[in-house]
Amino acid sequence: MAPAEILNGREISAQIRARLKNQVTQLKEQVPGFTPGLAILLVGNRDDSNLYINVKLKAAEEIGIKATHIKLPRTTTESEVIKYITSLNEDSTVHGFLVQLPLDSENSINTEEVINAIAPEKDVDGLTSISAGKLARGDLNDCFIPCTPKGCLELIKETGVPIAGRHAVVVGRSKIVGAPMHDLLLWNNATVTTCHSKTANLDEEVNKGDILVVATGRPEMVKGEWIKPGAIVIDCGINYVPDDKKPNGRKVVGDVAYDEAKERASFITPVPGGVGPMTVAMLMQSTVESAKRFLEKFKPGKWMIQYNNLNLKTPDPSDIDISRSCKPKPIGKLAREIGLLSEEVELYGETKAKVLLSALERLKHRPDGKYVVVTGITPTPLGEGKSTTTVGLVQALGAHLYQNVFACVRQPSQGPTFGIKGGAAGGGYSQVIPMEEFNLHLTGDIHAFTAANNLVAAAIDARIFHELTQTDKALFNRLVPSVNGVRKFSDIQIRRLKRLGIEKTDPTTLTDEEINRFARLDIDPETITWQRVLDTNDRFLRKITIGQAPTEKGHTRTAQFDISVASEIMAALALTTSLEDMRERLGKMVVASSKKGEPVSAEDLGVSGALTVLMKDAIKPNLMQTLEGTPVFVHAGPFANIAHGNSSIIADRIALKLVGPEGFVVTEAGFGADIGMEKFFNIKCRYSGLCPHVVVLVATVRALKMHGGGPTVTAGLPLPKAYIEENLELVEKGFSNLKKQIENARMFGIPVVVAVNAFKTDTEAELDLISRLSREHGAFDAVKCTHWAEGGNGALALAQAVQRAAQAPSSFQLLYDLKLPVEDKIRIIAQKIYGADDIELLPEAQHKAEVYTKQGFGNLPVCMAKTHLSLSHNPEQKGVPTGFILPIRDIRASVGAGFLYPLVGTMSTMPGLPTRPCFYDIDLDPETQQVNGLF
């Protein structure tokens, strides 16, 4: 018969590499910034191992795979190797890796333990027990196949001879080649015989094979006469034998006597140049396949998420009973369901986690989802259910309409939790769970704000004290101490010198005048705006005297405590867009003025770097879930009066990327639309650059009755009779407030959906009236909602209306230009949003407007600090007040956060405890550790 056709592994592997190169190019085009990653871990420094690795690195480079060669010394222990493997398992830029064998270490290392530490989804060498088990079971699409057997199969397929029904003989049973080759041929429908060192009559067994794969490691063991005529022969051997004709005195031969075998076989692989090049090509193919699987798993699209079914009961159980009736899914599972990588999530137990900002970097090329803001009409003191509506809406969009959806809400302060308000995490069957975690410490963010804020406060008073009690020289020497005879400025001090126009870096070269300017902030105590904070309601800290200890040498001053969430640091964090931006904002925070009227910042105090360290974890959003299993970001909780009252930009941005272009992110703005929504647009959206798609405006029958002239509503007291009996006239009269808030929302060019939050005392006629009037006066739609009693199903109509509204044309626009004078910006808000005739700047406010403009802060947006109980400055005026002049008694600056806040009336920044605080009902069961009485 004619000599066998040569299966040239070099040529075939070159074709495979060319195909892989094209695939990698396409992947990079489809996903900008993405590159398949391969890592090769070497223990020791064997020459042969380095040679093999270099071949793989070169192949990866040609294809476009980012390959990394990790070298560990011979002193490496088994635990150190496994630790490194664990880090590669969690590295999302590495899609496949292998451990080069043998392990060359002076320590005893269990190779099996090391190999099995590799995550199966990254086991591109196919050597883990899981990969072997799946191959043995025939799960070829759910495992990686060892590269040499995989290459052998490709060579066999290259012949064009069908494998199915053929008798295949595999000589050798190693874990790397022989055993997996048997399984691979078996699941390609061959009848397979495996031979080994104990096989009797090996020549007879070999002679039965239509397909023969030899991997024994013994030179030319299989003779040509053993081979069945016309067989396909795949020789995996690489052996060195003496040859005087070769310059190095040896030659390479396979496990088959090639010259004899090629006279009987129909196809045969040469050695070298047969199987060897295919092994490397298959490693590259598996790496590209792993990268594709990674992209498939984390590509934009519908989440594979498991929702929780609610067990609705009547009469309605308490909020806490409802919360505890639904077991949250493990938060790590939820994180995976929504497309977060393990290294992007820091678990805080089973029900809460922090999400790293690296997720935003990874997803930066993904289009954003639809952005929805939930706001409300001017509320009663009881609140109208914005948080409950936010949760109900996302449950409807996710668990019922199967959309990717995220809620982004503020973190509540602990002060009101133990004071008059009680817990807050939505309500009824629309809650964030577990509510105990939501309302208490969560992940410690507010404690971090408190520590950072009070560090600034301590720095202010300490600096005043030291400047009052030391000479310029002594002060300078302590600020720039001599270490081993050398004085050196810190980085933050060099930045201060540059701001002062002193272009020097050597402390010894400063003049006396420069030392004075550098060392003295010369803070005017009367101008200090920075207060200490505490996350507890404590009325007796509203005004205090500090510095009364003898050690302070009589340097006392009057000060106060605010509640922690009133801190500018909280507002700054919520408007931060990155870690670098947060560092800059913290440095810009103005805490006082000097006696010359110059602003003194946290950067001047030298404390901004330390603040960033304290806040490095607080910048990461907190991941929780709703009762029905949809994801929630809980992050930041600034006041809605002296601050902007919105959750963080960072949480919104990460959520918008995670949901993808067809998904929804629903966030809530504090208080009514005239306050929280206006600040959401003019401050938060201005800084984030995000454009909202829909406004959801929450209204209730009881609130409209109040605005229509109903009796006073008081928290803690039963509702008057007018609120629980049908009164269409009162509802229609009070609709004026809802109409005005619809107009306010539409002023920004965004479609408005009115959510009529229904209570059991409301009648259908009242609810229908509100919906009809809303549509007649500009709302895109208005729907009745029963999500408190029914969960997501009760907000289904609302969710569908939001979907339609998100597709409607919109033209988002801000209300004012930042370049306008401060007074004009205030006037625009007062007239257009509140309906005032004009504003009146009282002397202190006029003075502050001039000072801040002179200091360079006049171009900041305006954050109005006004009562939330009326469109006017008078909380007793309901409906739509007219003919009033809005008095501005003062203007203050949150320069780090990035806004000026005019004060309309008096704002309390430290709540007090009532006669009977909520803490009377709160306790812990010592046996179950269950929190009772929180709400």
UniProtKB/Swiss-Prot annotation:
GO terms for molecular function: ATP binding; formate-tetrahydrofolate ligase activity; methenyltetrahydrofolate cyclohydrolase activity; methylenetetrahydrofolate dehydrogenase (NADP+) activity. It comes from the Eukaryota. Its EC number is 1.5.1.5, 3.5.4.9, 6.3.4.3. GO terms for cellular component: cytosol. The modification Phosphoserine is found at residues 318, 413, 490. GO terms for biological process: L-histidine biosynthetic process; methionine biosynthetic process; purine nucleotide biosynthetic process; tetrahydrofolate interconversion. NADP(+) binds at residues 172-174, 197. It is found in: Cytoplasm. Gene3D superfamilies: 1.10.8.770, Formyltetrahydrofolate synthetase, domain 3, Leucine Dehydrogenase, chain A, domain 1, NAD(P)-binding Rossmann-like Domain, P-loop containing nucleotide triphosphate hydrolases. Transmembrane segments: none annotated. Its main location: cytoplasm. It catalyses: (6R)-5,10-methylene-5,6,7,8-tetrahydrofolate + NADP(+) = (6R)-5,10-methenyltetrahydrofolate + NADPH; (6R)-5,10-methenyltetrahydrofolate + H2O = (6R)-10-formyltetrahydrofolate + H(+); (6S)-5,6,7,8-tetrahydrofolate + formate + ATP = (6R)-10-formyltetrahydrofolate + ADP + phosphate. Homodimer. In the N-terminal section; belongs to the tetrahydrofolate dehydrogenase/cyclohydrolase family. In the C-terminal section; belongs to the formate--tetrahydrofolate ligase family. ATP binds at residues 380-387. The modification N-acetylmethionine is found at residue 1. The active site is at residue 56. Trifunctional enzyme that catalyzes the interconversion of three forms of one-carbon-substituted tetrahydrofolate: (6R)-5,10-methylene-5,6,7,8-tetrahydrofolate, 5,10-methenyltetrahydrofolate and (6S)-10-formyltetrahydrofolate. These derivatives of tetrahydrofolate are differentially required in nucleotide and amino acid biosynthesis, (6S)-10-formyltetrahydrofolate being required for purine biosynthesis while (6R)-5,10-methylene-5,6,7,8-tetrahydrofolate is used for serine and methionine biosynthesis for instance. It holds the Pfam family FTHFS. This is C-1-tetrahydrofolate synthase, cytoplasmic. Substrate binds at residues 52-56, 99-101, 272-276. Residues 2-291 are annotated as: Methylenetetrahydrofolate dehydrogenase and methenyltetrahydrofolate cyclohydrolase (D/C) domain. Residues 310-935 are annotated as: Formyltetrahydrofolate synthetase domain. The N-terminal methylenetetrahydrofolate dehydrogenase and methenyltetrahydrofolate cyclohydrolase (D/C) domain carries both the methylenetetrahydrofolate dehydrogenase and methenyltetrahydrofolate cyclohydrolase activities. The larger C-terminal formyltetrahydrofolate synthetase domain carries a third formyltetrahydrofolate synthetase activity. The gene is MTHFD1. Keywords: Acetylation, Amino-acid biosynthesis, ATP-binding, Cytoplasm, Histidine biosynthesis, Hydrolase, Ligase, Methionine biosynthesis, Multifunctional enzyme, NADP, Nucleotide-binding, One-carbon metabolism, Oxidoreductase, Phosphoprotein, Purine biosynthesis. It comes from Pongo abelii (Sumatran orangutan).
